[in-house]
């Protein structure tokens, strides 16, 4: 798909090398080139160790790249530091896999969401308090959540609170790094639906990172497939089955199909067992009626 707009984020030949003991090195990222366009959701999929989380940490400046460029709105932000970096982090937010690791256990949820609003001088006082309640409602949490501590929330509720904090500063880009993988399937689906809704409403660009191809395909416009630190293929989500050419992408697709087939088989067996149970119950009821008569 051709894009008429300029990319909001561009990674040019991004490399990240880790130095290990014994003068050994590991190339976590190898000349990665990717573009993210305004309003787009770019999925990044790959197995553990493929480099996808390293990529997210480099984009958000939690890690320094070894070489290459990170360009935001056509400006090189690769080596930002100090106040400039702090301001840049407002524009590129990140939602991690484990929300519990982000919270201060002694800070209530309301204060947690309000904190960046105050720190970035977006609003203050009563206005910030009202904004917290609005954000909670937007992610499907009640107003009473503001007075709760992190340990009083479920994993899904914690992730919703983290998302509320991230969208509160009105960033241009949000990175979701395995943001639903620690949740059970039903809660995961609710969070994915929330992300789709928020994207439609706000127009925020996003990068959704996961090892699960089916999940990535559900929320993304395009999918970048990473393998051993490289982007081996970028395909349109809607054309994945017909356009994917790389053997690794094909293997991911095959594993997704096998998992789906297994789920369908388990579901069919469950339904069959329930039907048999109902039939047995009906027989018991008929027998009881005949005996009582």
Model-identified regions with their sequence ranges:
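Short catalytic/signature loops enriched in Gly
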Residues: 2-7, 25, 234-276, 280-293
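ABC ATPase NBD coupling module
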Residues: 21-23, 77-93, 119, 239-244
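Helix-to-loop junction immediately C-terminal to a conserved catalytic motif
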Residues: 60
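Conserved ABC transporter NBD signature motif
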Residues: 68-76
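Conserved ABC ATPase "signature" region
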Residues: 76, 127-144, 253-254
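Conserved ABC ATPase signature
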Residues: 149-153, 157
